[in-house]
């Protein structure tokens, strides 16, 4: 299927959900670009803001490093960052648990 949407996906366990990623692309035309930390995902969003249509956020995620314990701090920072970008482009985000 032709890609309709490009979505940043921030989840510390995305590698365990490859079937979900494949289904999104093949059946729904949603390309998910995974990141394990909020820092890396938000840096990509900043670099290529106009290329992204949405963001999926894991409720408990790594903030800046995979050496951390996943917790809500990364989620709060990501939401705050996305909200700050709304003056440039409104990006919908979805929280997954």
Where do the PLM segments sit?
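Conserved acidic segment of CheY-like receiver
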Residues: 2-25
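A general structural motif
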Residues: 2-4, 50-52, 90
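Hydrophobic/aromatic residues located in beta-strands of well-ordered beta-sheets
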Residues: 7, 32, 92-94
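Short His-Asn-centered micro-motif
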Residues: 10-12, 58, 95-97
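Acidic, metal-coordinating helix/loop segments flanking the phosphotransfer/catalytic sites
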Residues: 14, 21, 33-58, 62
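Short, surface-exposed basic-aromatic patches at helix termini and helix-loop junctions that form
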Residues: 23-29, 46-49, 80-88
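A short, hydrophobic beta-strand element within the central beta-sheet of small alpha/beta folds
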Residues: 55, 76-97
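Short, flexible/disordered intra-domain loops and linkers
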Residues: 61-76
């Amino acid at each position: 299927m032709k890609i309709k949407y490009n979505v940043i996906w921030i989840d510390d366990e995305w590698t365990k959900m490859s079937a979900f990623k494949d289904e999104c692309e093949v059946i729904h035309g949603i390309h998910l670009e995974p990141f394990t930390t909020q820092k890396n995902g938000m840096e990509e969003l900043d670099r290529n803001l106009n290329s992204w249509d949405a963001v999926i956020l894991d409720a408990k995620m790594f903030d800046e490093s995979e050496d951390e314990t996943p917790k809500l701090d990364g989620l709060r920072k990501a939401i705050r960052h996305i909200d700050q970008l709304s003056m440039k482009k409104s990006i919908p985000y979805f929280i997954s648990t």
